[in-house]
Amino acid sequence: PDVAKLANDLKTRQTKSLASGIDVIMADLKESMEAPPTSIDGHTNALVLLYENPRAPHFSEPGTDWIKNADAHRAGLLAAETAIVLANYLRLLGYPSRGHTITSSDVDLGRLAVAAGLATVEEGRLSHPYIGQRFGLAAVTTTFDFNPDRPLAPMRAQPAKAFGAAWRLGTRSVKNASNAVPFAKRRFVDGAHPFENLKRVETPTTYIDEPNVARVPKRTDMFARVQFGDMGKKLQDSARGGHYVRKAAPSMAQRRALGAFVLLQDGDTARKKTRLDPDTAAELVKATSYWLGIDAVGISRCPTWAWYSHDAKGAPIDPPHDQAINMIVDQGYETMEGSSGDDWIAVAQSMRAYLRFSLIGGVVAKQIRNLGYSAKAH
Protein backbone atom coordinates (compact mmCIF):
# COMPACT_ATOMS: atom_id res chain seq x y z
CA PRO A 1 0.00 0.00 0.00
CA ASP A 2 2.85 2.45 0.69
CA VAL A 3 4.27 1.93 -2.81
CA ALA A 4 0.86 2.64 -4.33
CA LYS A 5 0.52 5.78 -2.20
CA LEU A 6 3.94 7.01 -3.30
CA ALA A 7 3.02 6.37 -6.94
CA ASN A 8 -0.15 8.43 -6.49
CA ASP A 9 1.82 11.22 -4.79
CA LEU A 10 4.20 11.33 -7.74
CA LYS A 11 1.20 11.82 -10.04
CA THR A 12 -0.67 14.40 -7.99
CA ARG A 13 1.55 16.26 -5.52
CA GLN A 14 3.43 19.46 -6.27
CA THR A 15 6.71 19.69 -4.38
CA LYS A 16 7.70 22.89 -2.62
CA SER A 17 11.38 23.01 -3.45
CA LEU A 18 13.88 25.25 -5.22
CA ALA A 19 16.27 22.33 -5.72
CA SER A 20 17.80 22.68 -9.17
CA GLY A 21 16.35 20.16 -11.61
CA ILE A 22 13.71 18.88 -9.18
CA ASP A 23 11.02 19.09 -11.89
CA VAL A 24 13.05 16.78 -14.15
CA ILE A 25 13.64 14.33 -11.30
CA MET A 26 9.97 14.18 -10.34
CA ALA A 27 8.89 13.70 -13.98
CA ASP A 28 11.45 10.89 -14.33
CA LEU A 29 10.19 9.19 -11.16
CA LYS A 30 6.57 9.50 -12.31
CA GLU A 31 7.40 7.86 -15.64
CA SER A 32 9.30 5.08 -13.86
CA MET A 33 6.33 4.27 -11.62
CA GLU A 34 4.00 4.13 -14.64
CA ALA A 35 6.32 2.05 -16.82
CA PRO A 36 5.45 -1.65 -17.26
CA PRO A 37 7.70 -4.19 -15.48
CA THR A 38 10.69 -5.40 -17.46
CA SER A 39 12.59 -8.68 -17.42
CA ILE A 40 16.09 -9.29 -16.07
CA ASP A 41 16.67 -12.23 -18.42
CA GLY A 42 19.59 -10.44 -20.06
CA HIS A 43 21.36 -9.70 -16.78
CA THR A 44 24.50 -11.79 -16.50
CA ASN A 45 26.16 -10.58 -13.30
CA ALA A 46 25.21 -9.61 -9.77
CA LEU A 47 26.68 -7.21 -7.23
CA VAL A 48 25.72 -8.39 -3.74
CA LEU A 49 25.66 -6.06 -0.74
CA LEU A 50 25.87 -7.17 2.89
CA TYR A 51 24.93 -4.69 5.62
CA GLU A 52 26.05 -5.45 9.16
CA ASN A 53 23.79 -4.78 12.12
CA PRO A 54 25.08 -3.64 15.52
CA ARG A 55 24.62 -5.78 18.59
CA ALA A 56 21.11 -6.40 19.90
CA PRO A 57 19.84 -3.84 22.45
CA HIS A 58 20.21 -4.88 26.07
CA PHE A 59 17.04 -5.70 28.01
CA SER A 60 16.80 -2.47 30.02
CA GLU A 61 18.99 -0.24 27.83
CA PRO A 62 17.63 3.33 27.70
CA GLY A 63 16.23 4.60 24.42
CA THR A 64 15.93 1.22 22.70
CA ASP A 65 12.19 0.52 22.84
CA TRP A 66 11.75 1.60 19.21
CA ILE A 67 14.56 -0.53 17.81
CA LYS A 68 14.21 -3.90 19.52
CA ASN A 69 13.69 -6.79 17.09
CA ALA A 70 14.02 -4.44 14.12
CA ASP A 71 17.44 -5.54 12.85
CA ALA A 72 16.08 -7.02 9.62
CA HIS A 73 14.31 -3.75 8.84
CA ARG A 74 17.41 -1.65 9.55
CA ALA A 75 19.79 -3.70 7.42
CA GLY A 76 17.21 -4.09 4.68
CA LEU A 77 16.60 -0.33 4.56
CA LEU A 78 20.28 0.64 4.37
CA ALA A 79 21.11 -2.11 1.89
CA ALA A 80 18.18 -1.07 -0.31
CA GLU A 81 19.44 2.52 -0.41
CA THR A 82 22.81 1.41 -1.78
CA ALA A 83 21.40 -1.15 -4.21
CA ILE A 84 18.97 1.33 -5.76
CA VAL A 85 21.65 4.01 -6.14
CA LEU A 86 24.20 1.63 -7.67
CA ALA A 87 21.63 0.19 -10.08
CA ASN A 88 20.79 3.71 -11.21
CA TYR A 89 24.51 4.50 -11.50
CA LEU A 90 25.11 1.55 -13.82
CA ARG A 91 22.09 2.50 -15.93
CA LEU A 92 23.48 6.02 -16.28
CA LEU A 93 26.68 4.44 -17.61
CA GLY A 94 24.61 2.57 -20.21
CA TYR A 95 24.19 -0.88 -18.64
CA PRO A 96 20.71 -2.30 -17.91
CA SER A 97 20.57 -2.91 -14.14
CA ARG A 98 18.04 -3.50 -11.38
CA GLY A 99 18.22 -3.28 -7.60
CA HIS A 100 16.81 -6.13 -5.53
CA THR A 101 15.85 -5.56 -1.90
CA ILE A 102 14.45 -7.53 0.99
CA THR A 103 10.94 -6.28 0.09
CA SER A 104 11.13 -6.41 -3.72
CA SER A 105 13.42 -8.91 -5.41
CA ASP A 106 13.48 -11.09 -8.51
CA VAL A 107 16.42 -13.13 -7.21
CA ASP A 108 17.22 -15.23 -4.14
CA LEU A 109 19.44 -12.89 -2.13
CA GLY A 110 20.73 -15.70 0.07
CA ARG A 111 21.89 -17.81 -2.86
CA LEU A 112 23.59 -14.80 -4.42
CA ALA A 113 25.37 -14.05 -1.13
CA VAL A 114 26.80 -17.58 -1.07
CA ALA A 115 27.79 -17.42 -4.75
CA ALA A 116 29.49 -14.04 -4.24
CA GLY A 117 31.59 -15.22 -1.31
CA LEU A 118 29.79 -13.17 1.33
CA ALA A 119 28.32 -16.01 3.35
CA THR A 120 28.27 -19.74 3.89
CA VAL A 121 25.45 -21.95 5.09
CA GLU A 122 26.20 -23.06 8.65
CA GLU A 123 23.67 -25.31 10.38
CA GLY A 124 21.02 -24.29 7.89
CA ARG A 125 21.52 -20.52 8.24
CA LEU A 126 23.52 -17.93 6.32
CA SER A 127 26.63 -16.84 8.20
CA HIS A 128 29.53 -14.49 7.53
CA PRO A 129 32.94 -15.54 8.96
CA TYR A 130 33.46 -12.28 10.88
CA ILE A 131 29.94 -10.91 11.26
CA GLY A 132 28.01 -14.07 11.97
CA GLN A 133 24.30 -13.73 11.26
CA ARG A 134 23.94 -10.00 12.09
CA PHE A 135 23.33 -8.79 8.55
CA GLY A 136 20.88 -8.01 5.78
CA LEU A 137 21.27 -8.27 2.02
CA ALA A 138 20.49 -6.49 -1.22
CA ALA A 139 21.76 -6.99 -4.76
CA VAL A 140 22.08 -5.41 -8.18
CA THR A 141 21.72 -7.55 -11.30
CA THR A 142 23.22 -6.09 -14.45
CA THR A 143 24.74 -6.62 -17.87
CA PHE A 144 27.88 -4.81 -16.68
CA ASP A 145 30.77 -7.25 -16.94
CA PHE A 146 33.10 -7.56 -13.95
CA ASN A 147 35.16 -10.37 -12.49
CA PRO A 148 33.17 -12.42 -9.95
CA ASP A 149 34.40 -13.34 -6.47
CA ARG A 150 34.78 -16.97 -5.51
CA PRO A 151 32.52 -18.62 -2.90
CA LEU A 152 33.84 -19.09 0.63
CA ALA A 153 34.86 -22.44 2.03
CA PRO A 154 32.78 -23.59 5.02
CA MET A 155 33.84 -22.25 8.43
CA ARG A 156 35.34 -25.58 9.44
CA ALA A 157 37.70 -25.35 6.44
CA GLN A 158 38.85 -21.76 7.08
CA PRO A 159 42.55 -21.40 8.03
CA ALA A 160 43.48 -20.50 11.60
CA LYS A 161 45.38 -17.39 10.43
CA ALA A 162 42.09 -15.83 9.31
CA PHE A 163 41.31 -15.39 13.01
CA GLY A 164 44.89 -15.17 14.29
CA ALA A 165 47.01 -12.42 15.80
CA ALA A 166 46.49 -9.98 12.93
CA TRP A 167 42.71 -10.21 13.39
CA ARG A 168 42.88 -9.97 17.16
CA LEU A 169 45.31 -7.03 17.18
CA GLY A 170 44.04 -5.23 14.08
CA THR A 171 47.44 -4.95 12.41
CA ARG A 172 46.16 -5.52 8.88
CA SER A 173 42.60 -4.23 8.87
CA VAL A 174 40.50 -1.40 10.25
CA LYS A 175 38.00 -3.94 11.52
CA ASN A 176 39.38 -6.40 14.05
CA ALA A 177 38.35 -8.55 16.98
CA SER A 178 38.29 -5.60 19.39
CA ASN A 179 35.88 -3.45 17.35
CA ALA A 180 34.12 -6.07 15.23
CA VAL A 181 30.70 -5.55 16.84
CA PRO A 182 29.36 -1.98 16.58
CA PHE A 183 28.36 -0.52 19.96
CA ALA A 184 29.65 -3.59 21.82
CA LYS A 185 31.08 -1.30 24.52
CA ARG A 186 28.80 1.73 24.12
CA ARG A 187 25.14 2.40 24.77
CA PHE A 188 23.25 3.36 21.62
CA VAL A 189 21.94 6.52 23.27
CA ASP A 190 25.52 7.77 23.82
CA GLY A 191 26.66 7.43 20.20
CA ALA A 192 29.95 5.99 18.98
CA HIS A 193 31.99 9.08 19.97
CA PRO A 194 32.66 10.02 23.62
CA PHE A 195 30.40 13.08 23.55
CA GLU A 196 29.92 12.78 27.31
CA ASN A 197 33.49 14.04 27.83
CA LEU A 198 32.82 17.37 26.12
CA LYS A 199 32.08 20.49 28.17
CA ARG A 200 28.57 21.90 27.80
CA VAL A 201 27.38 25.50 28.33
CA GLU A 202 23.95 27.06 28.79
CA THR A 203 24.10 29.26 25.68
CA PRO A 204 26.17 29.22 22.48
CA THR A 205 29.60 30.85 22.65
CA THR A 206 28.65 33.22 19.83
CA TYR A 207 26.26 35.93 21.05
CA ILE A 208 22.96 35.95 19.18
CA ASP A 209 20.80 39.08 19.43
CA GLU A 210 17.65 37.00 19.10
CA PRO A 211 14.94 39.72 19.02
CA ASN A 212 16.72 41.44 16.14
CA VAL A 213 17.73 38.51 13.93
CA ALA A 214 16.09 39.12 10.56
CA ARG A 215 14.25 36.23 8.94
CA VAL A 216 14.87 35.94 5.20
CA PRO A 217 12.96 34.07 2.48
CA LYS A 218 14.12 30.76 1.04
CA ARG A 219 14.66 32.67 -2.22
CA THR A 220 17.78 34.29 -0.67
CA ASP A 221 19.87 31.12 -0.35
CA MET A 222 22.71 30.71 -2.81
CA PHE A 223 21.24 27.75 -4.71
CA ALA A 224 18.07 29.75 -5.38
CA ARG A 225 19.93 32.94 -6.28
CA VAL A 226 22.08 31.10 -8.82
CA GLN A 227 19.00 29.62 -10.51
CA PHE A 228 17.29 33.00 -10.76
CA GLY A 229 20.40 34.58 -12.30
CA ASP A 230 21.46 36.76 -9.36
CA MET A 231 25.05 35.52 -9.73
CA GLY A 232 25.26 36.01 -13.50
CA LYS A 233 24.34 34.03 -16.60
CA LYS A 234 27.37 31.73 -16.54
CA LEU A 235 26.55 30.35 -13.11
CA GLN A 236 22.85 30.26 -13.93
CA ASP A 237 23.53 28.10 -16.99
CA SER A 238 25.76 25.81 -14.92
CA ALA A 239 22.94 25.28 -12.42
CA ARG A 240 20.12 24.83 -14.92
CA GLY A 241 18.49 21.43 -14.53
CA GLY A 242 20.93 20.56 -11.75
CA HIS A 243 23.87 20.45 -14.17
CA TYR A 244 26.45 20.63 -11.38
CA VAL A 245 25.00 17.36 -10.09
CA ARG A 246 24.21 15.70 -13.42
CA LYS A 247 27.74 16.12 -14.76
CA ALA A 248 28.94 13.34 -12.44
CA ALA A 249 27.24 9.96 -12.68
CA PRO A 250 27.60 8.97 -8.98
CA SER A 251 25.93 12.14 -7.71
CA MET A 252 23.19 11.99 -10.32
CA ALA A 253 22.48 8.38 -9.33
CA GLN A 254 21.92 9.53 -5.75
CA ARG A 255 19.92 12.59 -6.80
CA ARG A 256 17.12 10.45 -8.23
CA ALA A 257 16.58 8.71 -4.90
CA LEU A 258 16.74 12.06 -3.13
CA GLY A 259 13.91 13.29 -5.32
CA ALA A 260 11.67 10.47 -4.12
CA PHE A 261 12.49 11.27 -0.49
CA VAL A 262 11.21 14.83 -0.97
CA LEU A 263 7.70 13.35 -0.88
CA LEU A 264 8.47 11.49 2.35
CA GLN A 265 9.89 14.39 4.35
CA ASP A 266 6.47 15.31 5.71
CA GLY A 267 3.12 13.58 6.15
CA ASP A 268 -0.03 13.10 8.16
CA THR A 269 0.15 12.99 11.95
CA ALA A 270 -1.55 10.24 13.95
CA ARG A 271 -4.69 11.47 15.69
CA LYS A 272 -3.84 9.94 19.07
CA LYS A 273 -0.85 11.37 20.94
CA THR A 274 1.49 9.07 22.83
CA ARG A 275 2.65 10.78 26.02
CA LEU A 276 6.37 10.55 26.80
CA ASP A 277 8.42 12.43 29.35
CA PRO A 278 11.07 14.67 27.71
CA ASP A 279 14.06 12.66 28.96
CA THR A 280 12.64 9.40 27.63
CA ALA A 281 11.76 11.04 24.31
CA ALA A 282 15.31 12.38 23.93
CA GLU A 283 16.79 8.95 24.67
CA LEU A 284 14.51 7.27 22.13
CA VAL A 285 15.39 9.76 19.39
CA LYS A 286 19.14 9.59 20.02
CA ALA A 287 19.41 5.82 20.37
CA THR A 288 17.31 5.26 17.25
CA SER A 289 19.33 7.75 15.21
CA TYR A 290 22.68 6.26 16.21
CA TRP A 291 21.40 2.72 15.68
CA LEU A 292 20.28 3.64 12.17
CA GLY A 293 23.73 5.06 11.33
CA ILE A 294 23.78 8.80 12.10
CA ASP A 295 27.24 9.92 13.27
CA ALA A 296 26.16 12.68 15.66
CA VAL A 297 22.78 13.85 16.90
CA GLY A 298 21.80 16.76 19.14
CA ILE A 299 18.46 18.12 20.31
CA SER A 300 17.75 21.83 20.60
CA ARG A 301 14.97 24.37 20.62
CA CYS A 302 14.09 25.74 17.18
CA PRO A 303 13.64 29.49 17.67
CA THR A 304 11.58 31.61 15.30
CA TRP A 305 14.67 33.27 13.85
CA ALA A 306 15.96 29.91 12.61
CA TRP A 307 13.09 29.65 10.13
CA TYR A 308 12.91 31.21 6.67
CA SER A 309 10.28 33.94 6.43
CA HIS A 310 8.83 32.51 3.18
CA ASP A 311 8.97 29.06 1.60
CA ALA A 312 10.08 28.12 -1.92
CA LYS A 313 6.70 29.15 -3.34
CA GLY A 314 6.85 32.54 -1.65
CA ALA A 315 4.22 31.74 0.97
CA PRO A 316 4.85 33.13 4.48
CA ILE A 317 6.08 30.57 7.02
CA ASP A 318 4.47 30.53 10.45
CA PRO A 319 7.05 28.41 12.33
CA PRO A 320 5.21 25.16 13.11
CA HIS A 321 7.82 23.55 15.37
CA ASP A 322 9.70 24.89 18.38
CA GLN A 323 12.13 21.97 18.77
CA ALA A 324 14.73 20.45 16.45
CA ILE A 325 16.65 17.21 16.13
CA ASN A 326 20.00 17.99 14.49
CA MET A 327 21.93 15.24 12.73
CA ILE A 328 25.44 15.02 11.29
CA VAL A 329 26.55 12.58 8.60
CA ASP A 330 30.32 12.14 8.37
CA GLN A 331 31.51 12.56 4.77
CA GLY A 332 34.88 10.97 5.51
CA TYR A 333 38.15 12.84 5.89
CA GLU A 334 40.00 10.54 3.49
CA THR A 335 37.34 11.07 0.84
CA MET A 336 37.47 14.85 1.15
CA GLU A 337 41.28 14.84 1.08
CA GLY A 338 41.21 12.65 -2.01
CA SER A 339 39.06 15.06 -3.97
CA SER A 340 40.37 17.86 -6.15
CA GLY A 341 37.07 19.70 -5.83
CA ASP A 342 36.43 19.27 -9.55
CA ASP A 343 35.94 15.54 -9.89
CA TRP A 344 33.31 12.82 -9.43
CA ILE A 345 34.06 12.69 -5.69
CA ALA A 346 33.36 16.33 -4.86
CA VAL A 347 29.62 16.40 -5.51
CA ALA A 348 28.99 12.71 -4.82
CA GLN A 349 30.23 12.90 -1.21
CA SER A 350 27.78 15.70 -0.46
CA MET A 351 24.94 13.89 -2.18
CA ARG A 352 25.74 10.77 -0.16
CA ALA A 353 25.38 12.71 3.08
CA TYR A 354 22.16 14.38 1.89
CA LEU A 355 20.74 11.02 0.86
CA ARG A 356 21.68 9.29 4.11
CA PHE A 357 20.07 12.04 6.18
CA SER A 358 16.96 12.11 3.98
CA LEU A 359 16.58 8.39 4.59
CA ILE A 360 17.29 8.27 8.33
CA GLY A 361 15.87 11.70 9.15
CA GLY A 362 12.74 10.75 7.25
CA VAL A 363 12.39 7.55 9.28
CA VAL A 364 12.75 9.40 12.60
CA ALA A 365 10.28 12.11 11.51
CA LYS A 366 7.78 9.44 10.45
CA GLN A 367 8.10 7.70 13.82
CA ILE A 368 7.40 10.98 15.62
CA ARG A 369 4.32 11.58 13.43
CA ASN A 370 3.17 8.05 14.25
CA LEU A 371 3.18 9.10 17.91
CA GLY A 372 0.85 12.00 17.18
CA TYR A 373 3.31 14.88 16.83
CA SER A 374 3.99 17.02 13.78
CA ALA A 375 7.50 16.47 12.39
CA LYS A 376 9.30 17.15 9.12
CA ALA A 377 12.75 16.26 7.83
CA HIS A 378 14.71 19.18 6.34
Question: What does each model-identified segment do?
Answer:
Residues 1-20, 24, 40-46, 153-301, ...:
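Iron-sulfur (Fe-S) cluster-binding modules
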Residues 2-161, 286, 292-378:
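Catalytic cores of enzyme domains
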